[in-house]
Amino acid sequence: MSKYILALDQGTTSSRAILFTREGDIKQIAQKEFTQIYPQPGWVEHNANEIFDTQSWVMTECLQRAGVNASEVAAIGITNQRETTVVWDRKSGAPVHNAIVWQDRRTASICDEMKKRGLAETIREKTGLVIDAYFSGTKVKWILDNVPGARAKAERGELCFGTIDTWVIWNLTKGKEHVTDESNASRTMLFNIHTGDWDEELLKILDVPRSMLPRVAGSSEVVAETHPEFLGKAVPVSGIAGDQQAATFGNACLTEGMAKNTYGTGCFMLLNTGKQAHISKNNLLTTTGWNTPSGRYYCLEGSVFIAGAVVQWLRDGLGIIQSAPEVEQLALSVPDNGGVVLVPAFAGLGAPHWDQYARGTMVGVTRGTTKAHIARAALESIALQTLDIMDCMQKDAGINLAALRADGGATRNNLLMQFQADVLGVPVERPKVTETTALGAAYLAGLAVGFWKSEDEITAMWQLDRRFEPNMSAEVREKLVYNWKRAVERSKEWAED
């Protein structure tokens, strides 16, 4: 009898495979980093073949380390960095260009052009998104317009487009399945979140041939089987969700009004709004959460581009820490930020500002400023960006959050979690299993094959590790927030020229 579900978690900096038991516990993990390519300032690429090679390697490695064979795996769930765009040759399977990553800003001018054409309202109404270089649609257009011969091949039906889930499944099935799910499709700027299908008007606006697009499946259904070559036997692929939607599901935020924040490379807060798509009046995104047999669920989302990446910058860019976990002790060595505010707008500002020309800014620096103050200001910036989003979410949905569930690598940082509760003024709940992105993909896959019986069973499995209660005076909080808002204004529209 099958005892496990295997989650493939294809992230921005590494590919991972995580094996889960029926209790939702982790049996084994394998992880492999891959190359980040920065051809020009503001451009970020990945080698699509390296993405699949690392994903395939960790999949096999995870099972080997666990001493588990493929016949014990009931199904595979896939979750992935969203928006990152691959275009490949339908016949040979070869990418025509490196994958263009979600952080990449090269299509900012295409976005400006679309805004000038007065398309913002159409895009928001149909897709729930704002016009921004973040989403896949303009990246596909850029590849078709800039890779010699690509547009002609696309018109002839010879090219495929996919987000990373689609690319991984295409390769796992040796080109047999070209498929995505609604959560990923809803991040392309080509998909109508109300009809649940690709939108002809949007395809026309971005000049993308429909023949390139994958079919759109549910998030929890058997969509493919792996080619036996990979694991020695075919294993069903029965769960797909973009990383943030998967994390929402994995954190058991399955009912309307529940919210989670994932602290990874970026920071992503999602609020489950049930079966109703709320189009935001506060510059948040409306996105499909998941489409399962129980229905299509929507979320409000606020995206922060730089969260954990600010700690990587302290390590790799400034060299003030040797490893990411050191940041907590360094920040704790001072009682406060010493007046320093850091706005990590390295790739522009995400929600609710959506300023692609904002740049990183550090203010309040004096001769007395030390690396500890900068480290503390960096951690605080993660929590303060989250506060900006929560304020907007509460306005849009007309609710006051009772608590925020937190997941992702940076939740291990107790100082950050406590500071987050302090500035939000609501408790922050950290679950026992913080790998909720992979867990969400596992849940979606397991539900589709009867490994778990119901969403109620999943809700009951969620376990609390620690609850951080707000513990900051209103006066201190107000001063921090006031200085933060001033610093954000100074970071805006810097790169206009």
Swiss-Prot record:
Main EC class the enzyme belongs to: transferase
One Pfam family named in its UniProt record: FGGY_C
Keywords: ATP-binding, Glycerol metabolism, Kinase, Nucleotide-binding, Transferase
Database matches in PANTHER family: GLYCEROL KINASE (PTHR10196:SF69), SUGAR KINASE (PTHR10196)
Superkingdom in the source lineage: Bacteria
Gene Ontology biological-process annotations: glycerol catabolic process; glycerol metabolic process; glycerol-3-phosphate metabolic process
Binding-site residues for ATP, renumbered to this chain: T12, T13, S14, T265, G308, Q312, G409
Protein's UniProt keywords contain ATP-binding: yes
Modes of activity regulation: Inhibited by fructose 1,6-bisphosphate (FBP).
Species per Swiss-Prot/TrEMBL record: Oleidesulfovibrio alaskensis (strain ATCC BAA-1058 / DSM 17464 / G20) (Desulfovibrio alaskensis)
Binding site for ADP: T12, R16, T265, G308, G409, N413
Pathway: Polyol metabolism; glycerol degradation via glycerol kinase pathway; sn-glycerol 3-phosphate from glycerol: step 1/1
Name recorded for this polypeptide: Glycerol kinase
SUPFAM superfamilies: Actin-like ATPase domain
Residue numbers binding sn-glycerol 3-phosphate: T12, R82, E83, Y134, D243
Keyword Iron: no
